[in-house]
Amino acid sequence: MASNKFLGQGLTYDDVLLVPAYSETLPREVSLKSRFSKNIPLNIPVISAAMDTVTESKMAIAMAREGGIGVLHKNMTIEEQAIKVRAVKRSESGMIIDPVTLPETALVSDANLNMQQYKIGGIPIVDSNKKLIGIVTNRDLRFEKNKNRPIREVMTSKNLITVNEGTSLQDAEQILQKHKIEKLPVVSKDNTLVGLITFRDITKHFTKPNANKDKYGRLRVAAAVGVTSDVLERVETLNNAGVDAIVIDTAHGHSKGVGVVVKKVKNQFKELDVVVGNIATADAAKYLVDIGADAVKVGIGPGSICTTRVIAGVGYPQLTAIIEVSKALEGSDIPIIADGGIRYTGDIPKAIAAGADAVMLGSLLAGTRESPGETVIYEGRKYKTYRGMGSVEAMKMGSKYRYFQDVEDDFKKLVPEGIVGRVPFKGDLNESIHQFVGGLRAGMGYCGAKDINALKKNGKFITITSAGIRESHPHNISVTKEAPNYSPS
């Protein structure tokens, strides 16, 4: 067999350890700021995966509040995905610049529907010229039994408290407290509604200072699209809803079809960052950057629920893949996202030292309260369902496009590249993020890295044997109390 058939040895996270170095940096002093894509920053280098048991609006909101970003999955209609984008963008803001409004001809039922759909507690009422004429809150509707009653009969219109454009959050907070109200409409000189400030948003602004927000103070969110005939329609709808970035999400990003879609999207939506994946080689990375990708996503088969490597016989050990892609993109200013294979918090600094700017997590987030997976009880313990987007169940819901099987209508003929399982329930996301960030900070402290770029530039590895792996884990002892950030697997 020709020697050029073998490209060398491939390593993954368990095959290496980071080498400790002289340090003048304490873990609590390091900066975790990084990038999701060329123009989208991160305050922590953690991203939730575009999977239908991982990221919907609740997860995306929670991720952005912690400083990361969530990628909404595509297994839903275009409008459903856009609604979830708007839910994230409206969940909190310094000032909501496009608040949900209703005309004075609306009914109580219309207000109830909008409050439920967008998870909001108040709606400004405007006339045909967008002039503010009142506001209705959930307190106005709480005991209203006549759902067909006109909204103008229940809204607050007299002595309406408003502020002018340019009012600071500090001043707005004082006005809200003085008048004991929770919603403060912002109007122009001619009383045109231009925004809405809420007490809840002000509180979150000060309690979550690390939140990842856009220039308007809204939480950031990304959304996945596929190589499909309606991709431009989907991207346009998502863009109009306020999405911060698009992820063109396929199992094999180094392909002609992906290239065609990337060029179309970048040509029509020049202001929108486009992340493209998945890939695993230097050639693939160069290809995606040449066609306009604003970030690349690395990972062919490393995920815990992915069977691509054993079904198709194709893949690339994740650590080596990140290193190869990083070398290929050196000097390009294109961020690299390491997608899949993260089992322990220590794998995060390994991925970054290999060249990644951020990691994308699936299984480690699927057990949190904010994930959309079903909660189940098994043998007295609580779990949440978690499935690969290549599983038959997910492909039936729409992800078959990701594996280039979108022309197959007979579900029995689908060739899955993923499985369905369950993961232990972990509670609130912020508790898990605290452990992930703590492990990363510790790793950076050991390596003397004051920020993400320093870890990428100076991190060094040593390969270890199977004996080294055993030595790395607790051994020669029976664990009697589980740690919050470790479980044997």
Please report, for each region that a protein language model flagged, where it lies by residue.
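Catalytic beta/alpha-barrel core
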Residues: 72-75, 101-102, 122-124, 162-163, ...
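Glycine-rich phosphate-binding active-site loops on the catalytic face of alpha/beta enzymes
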Residues: 65-80, 189, 243-255, 294-312, ...
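Short beta-strand/loop segments at the ligand-binding rim of alpha/beta enzyme cores
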Residues: 41-48, 94-99, 214-224, 266-280, ...
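Alpha/beta catalytic cores of nucleotide-metabolism and tRNA/nucleoside-modifying enzymes
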Residues: 1-22, 102, 164, 171-174, ...
